[in-house]
Amino acid sequence: MQATKTGNASTVFVVDDEASVRDSLTWLLNSISLDVRTFESAKDFLDADISCTHGCVVLDVRMQNVSGLQLQQALSERGFKLPIIFLSAYGDAQMGAQAVKKGAFDFLQKPYRNQDLLDAVNAALALNREMADKQNEKQKHLDLLATLSQREMEILDKVVAGSSSKEIAKLLGISYKTVEAHRGRIISKLGLKSTGDLMHFVMRGSSHCSDCGRQPLPGSSPCRPAA
């Protein structure tokens, strides 16, 4: 494995068993100030400590022992999230379709134009940054929600489900004023100003439950039983 540092926050991981290809890709990517780490085999890449969360992978399809497609599958099973750009000298349309179907970002045929590769890498890095921003936003939601008490979470869940303060008070066996006090503290802890802001906050950090169609709170189980 070889690494070249330019100070860029993103890293392009190049996996190709041809030294000339690795060298040319390193030169090309360094020319636009991208950090590069190269590997001559899928095994070397799998054995490496890839802790970087910002970047993409440029991967040769046909390599000895473990092919690019097999490496893609292994990375998928490990939960590896960086976008993958495949390079192939064989122009196999079916193989390209298979790779993209399994989540590859792009598939380029050798010999490729330098600009085509740079465009693909820049697009992959932009996608990775977008994914990272969304993950960071989700984590911020979770961190804020973690400041709420169990009772506040119960009330928030019911507010999001559309229950009024009077309905929540009846469901939980507490007074209307207590519900309103909890609602105010929830809004304050989350750094919001209104119930409308509260609904928007939850919707931005949630996804629909595949079982019941409800939109659960971030970090909660999809179908939480009523308290």
Swiss-Prot record:
InterPro entries: CheY-like_superfamily (IPR011006), Sig_transdc_resp-reg_C-effctor (IPR016032), Sig_transdc_resp-reg_receiver (IPR001789), Tscrpt_reg_LuxR_C (IPR000792), WH-like_DNA-bd_sf (IPR036388). Disulfide bonds: none annotated. Residues 141-206 form the HTH luxR-type domain. Residues 11-125 form the Response regulatory domain. Phosphorylated by TdiS. The keyword Phosphoprotein applies. Keywords: DNA-binding, Phosphoprotein, Transcription, Transcription regulation, Two-component regulatory system. It comes from the Bacteria. The keyword Membrane does not apply. One of its GO terms (molecular function) is DNA binding. This is Transcriptional regulatory protein TdiR. It comes from Thauera aromatica.
